[in-house]
Design a protein with these regions (language model features):
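Surface-exposed, low-hydrophobicity beta-strand/loop segments enriched in small/polar/acidic residues
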Residues: 1-98
Length: 98
């Protein structure tokens, strides 16, 4: 097995509001890794929360906490960038993009 193989996707670990990428790209996946406090995760095509809302992951119930390790597939073209915003959410996600 060759450890130097490139798979083409970048992974960014997110635990707060952040610009994941600036510029044109593809939003591939969002993986919910862990939840400390339930809330919402918003994904925008842009560099801040004024961009176009692409997705809202609602993790507001006790049942949602059991989603840890769940991956949401988008494969969505982003013209401006990827911005992630947490509302009442404390936890950890991974955004995969190219």
């Amino acid at each position: 097995m060759n450890p130097n193989i490139s798979f083409g996707w970048n992974g960014t670990n997110v635990d707060d509001d952040v610009i994941v990428h600036t510029g044109r790209c593809i939003l591939h996946n969002v993986t919910l890794n862990g939840v400390t406090t339930v809330g919402d995760i918003a994904i925008y095509n842009g560099t801040d929360a004024t961009g176009t809302l692409i997705a809202t992951i609602n993790a507001r119930t006790a049942v949602a906490v059991s989603f840890q390790g769940m991956t949401f597939n988008y494969d969505c073209e982003m013209s401006t960038g990827i911005f992630v915003s947490f509302t009442d959410f404390a936890g950890n996600i991974t955004v995969t993009w190219a």
